Each structure stands twice: as C-alpha cells, then as structure tokens.
Amino acid sequence: MLFRSEDEVEAIHLASLKVLQDHGIDFLEPDARALFPKDGVKITDARVRFDPEFVTETIKTAPSEFTLHARNPEHSLRIGGNWMAFGSVASPPNFVELDGTRHAGTRQNFQDLLKLTQMFNIIHFVAGYPVEPVDLHSSIRHLETTYDMLTMTDKALHCYSLGRQRNQDVLELTRIARQVSNEQIDNEPSVFTIINSSSPLRLDIPMLQGIMEFSKRGQLVIITPFTLAGAMAPVTLAGALSLQNAEALSGIVFSQLVRPGAPVAYGGFTSNVDMQSGAPAFGTPEYMRTAMAGGQLARRYGVPYRSSNVCAANALDAQAAYESVFSLWGAIQGGVNFLMHGAGWMEGGLHASLPKLDRKSTRLNSSHANISYAVFCLKK
C-alpha cells in the first residue's frame, strides 16, 4: 500500500541523509569505528558523520531476499520480497495465566509458551524469550533458554545481543543443533538478532558487537530504532520517521562494512507517547501510519522490513483488540516481511498473555488467509 507519496518518501530519505551528514551517529565501540574507511565518513571522538554518497553506495550490497534456516528445513523461512513471517511474543518480564493471575516470568512459563509457539503453525519463528525467565541467573540465562528453544522447537530463533561472548555461545549452540560445520552456518543464516539504537543518534557497545559478530558470520541482523515521537524523537511523524530512517541506515551501512552481502533488515518501531505521562503508546493511528511508511522506506532501499504487533492495553479487552488490529494491519499494509510479537504481547510489553497468544494466533490465521486470497486474485 502506498501511504506516503514518492515525493514524501524521498523527502524523508534526504532529511535522513542530512542528519547523518550534519549530525552523525555515536558509535560507542572503538572496534566498530576502526572498521570505517578514511573516505566517506568523518569521525570525531565517538561521532561518525556519513557522506550521502557513501551511504547510498554501501547499502547496495545488502540482499533483498534470503533464507533463514531452521533446525527443521520445513520451517526455514524466505525473508524479503512478498514473503511474510509471523513471530511469537518476546521479552516481557511478567506472565498472565489463563485465570488472570499476573506474576514474574519463570522458566516453566517460558517453556509453556515455547510449546505453544511450536504448536501453532501460523507462528513461524521464535521471536525471543516469550517471557523473561527471571528465575534463571542472568549469567547462564542465554545458555539455558537457547537450549530450550533448540530442543522444544524446530523453528528459526532469535539471539539477544548482550555481548560478544553470548552471541558466540548462541551461534555455537545453533550450529550444534543443526549439525552443520562452521563454514556452512557462516553461509546459511540460522539465527537473527534485533539491534535497537539508543535514540537519538547512538549505537551502544552491545548492539555494535552484535552487528559485528552476526554480520561477519553471515547471520541476520535487524536494525530497529526505537523512536517515540515527543520523547526521544521529533513530535511530528515526518520528523520521527526521518530520525528512525537515519539510525536504521547507519546500522545497515555498518553491517555491510563488516561483511558486504550480509543479511540485514530494516526495522520500524516508531510510535507516539502519552503526553501527560510520557508512557509509550502502541496500536495508535500514529503507530499504524509509521508502520506503513516504514515499509515504503525499506522497499526504497531494497531490504526486508520488520514491524511488530503491539498494544498498550492492560487487560484482554476491547482496547487490546483495537490496538492489536491497528498494529497488525499497519504492518501488513506496510508490506511487513518479519512480524515480531505476533501473538501474546500486552501492556506495552510488560507482560505476556497466555489467553491473548491463543486468540491472536487465530487472528493471524485469518489475516494470512485474507492476504493469500488477495495475492491469488491479483495473480489471476
């Protein structure tokens, strides 16, 4: 769907290039700054400023489509083009039972949600920890959870970029589970990571290490600025999208410097805030519009697009339904290729809802069927 005109998309693109040229992005990892060539960028302390021509030329090596390999080849995913994949809820610290009881997430809750993720065919990949298992010590949590994801599901999975060693651990566990060589996994994307910039205009050390570790091993990196209009981004949607686009481009460029042709995707996560409390708002008309516009920007650069199915409602009520529908339909009309938090997200990401995961999976099935029929009619 064309939400913004071609002139409007081009205006956002040019504004983003001006931000990168005049203001630049803070790259806090010294090893990351060392990878930039002398020509095309200007580095002052941690701030990297980009020449527009350098940006547009460097991103040309990013692939428009690729396969994300799962442990079970039948669950491998084609990412990009007209392909669409839905993921589970990810990262909430709390869990809501079927009877409405709310408590901190445990490993048992984590495993229960993994079983449902494996069971529902409409959920195509494990988007992360369906709920944070806070009873696992943080020093070993990535090992235990990755073991669970690799043994209780056979779908593609996510790795949190929490430092170089943890990234390497997850990649090695995934390689062992797939029973492939280092050379093979380096040429077959098998795990993905989400890279969130610290808006405005900063990429911190764990995120940059994630890009370096994953891109050099040929794994999928999804650059997703978290830009809230009226908070860490301009209050206008055009301004917020320009900031989102500038930060996304900087990450995409860096991934291609690490390894030209490495799989990378453009993530859109721009919304507004409650101007009285400052709390993030999701599923709003503003979120829906930026989700659609983000897809247009991703297609302009020829890379896959990631969006999310989110809401801010505290209970499974009409508010939750409306916000989720707006988020989902904005993403779909934006041509999303990779939908995070497809089912189960509630309360602005503060809790994973078992009832909502069940109901939203049904809604995803309905949306998928409608889209498939529409594509069939267009091809006729």
Language model segments and positions:
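Phosphate/pyrophosphate-binding betaalpha-module
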Residues: G210, A248-P304
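Catalytic alpha/beta active-site cores
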Residues: R49-P234, A238
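C-terminal catalytic subdomain
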Residues: Y305, A315-R363
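Catalytic-core signal marking the mid-to-C-terminal active-site face
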Residues: F3-A15, H23, L28-L35, D45, ...
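Single conserved hydrophobic/aromatic residue that forms the stacking wall/gate
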Residues: L2, L364-K380
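Glycine-rich phosphate/pyrophosphate-binding loops
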Residues: P225, Q256-G268, P304-N309, G334-E347
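Acidic, His- and aromatic-enriched active-site or binding-groove loops in soluble protein domains
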Residues: Y147-A156, S242-S250, T290, W329
